Each structure stands twice: as structure tokens, then as C-alpha cells.
Amino acid sequence: MTRAAPDTISFATRRSILLLSLGTFASMAAQRICDAMLPELSRVFDVGLAQAAQVVSLFAITYGIAQLFYGPLGDRMGQFRVITCAALFCCVGSLVAVFSRSLDMLLFARVLMALGAAALIPLAMAWVGDAVPANQLQEMLTRTGLGSTMGIVGGQLAGGLLTDLLGWRWAFAFMT
């Protein structure tokens, strides 16, 4: 009795999975980048800590709502295309944050970032599910998801270190 050769994953698919993992990293890093900088934002914009924390809350709310729309959009326009556009949108939001002169402008930038970041994880997982053979799906989903786990830690670490060493704007420049 002969065994069927296992389905293999092409180099192009593996490269795409690596890029998607970087995208999921960016999504979670964008979400957590402000955690450690809240006291500095409170000081710079001369507002209370609760008001400065809106940069985290507004991002999370926008992120959660926006995710609902990306599945159908990815099905209609193509997952990778939507991921690419969303990543660029997140970068634009980060760039707006770098040049924010008021808390309101920073809040607007965080909404832009969230609108982009919200697409990255669900569409990356969907793309992997469509592109990878069933017998290797769990491993590839884990590799893709590893990016988001690392992004949680990386975002908090980068936000704190860059804010302390260079200033809060550099944390957003890092996300660009």
C-alpha cells in the first residue's frame, strides 16, 4: 500500500503567510502602542488620564465594529487586496498621529488606525484558510496568529520605550 504525498505549501504561499503574520503583528501593535504612553499624552495635551485614555478606548471600539464589515468586503474585493489597502490606511493613521497637535487630532488618527488595523487579523486568517491544504492548516494559522501575539507585547514595549527615549510621536512613527 502506498501513501499519498502530503500536500505541500509553495514558497509564494509561505512568503505570503510571513507577510500576513507581520500584518497581524502590526494590527495588535497598533492597538497596544498607546498603553504605556498615556501619562505622557495626559501631560502633553494637559488633560486628565481618563481623557487621554480615549486614544485606547476609541481605537478598541472602532476596531471591533469595523471587523464586522471586512469579511464581506474581503470576499467581494479579494482578501489580499483589502489587507493591503487596510495596512496602508493604518499607516496613514499613524502618520496623522505623528503630526497631531491636539488630543482631538490624535483621536481622529487613532480611528483611522483602527479602521485599517481591524481588517488585518480576520482577513489574514481567512486567506490562510483558503490557501493552505487542510492537513497543514493548523500549523499555518498558528504561524500567522503568532504575529498578533507578538504584536501585543511588541506594541506595548515599543510604545513605552520610544515614548521614554524619543517622545510619543516616535512610537507612531515606528508604526508607519
Residue ranges and their predicted role:
Residues 109-148:
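Cytoplasmic helix-loop-helix junction between adjacent transmembrane helices
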Residues 32, 60-68, 152-153:
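Residue-level signature of mid-helix packing/kink "hotspots" within the transmembrane helices
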Residues 15-49, 67-70:
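Extracytoplasmic
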Residues 1-23:
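Cytosolic juxtamembrane N-terminal segment immediately preceding the first transmembrane helix
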Residues 93, 104-112:
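Paired small-residue
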Residues 24, 56, 60, 87, ...:
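Small-residue-rich transmembrane alpha-helices and their cytosolic helix-loop interfaces
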Residues 105, 143-176:
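Helix-loop-helix hairpin linking two adjacent transmembrane segments in secondary transporters
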Residues 65-101:
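Conserved MFS/SLC helix-loop-helix module at the cytosolic interface between two early adjacent transmembrane helices
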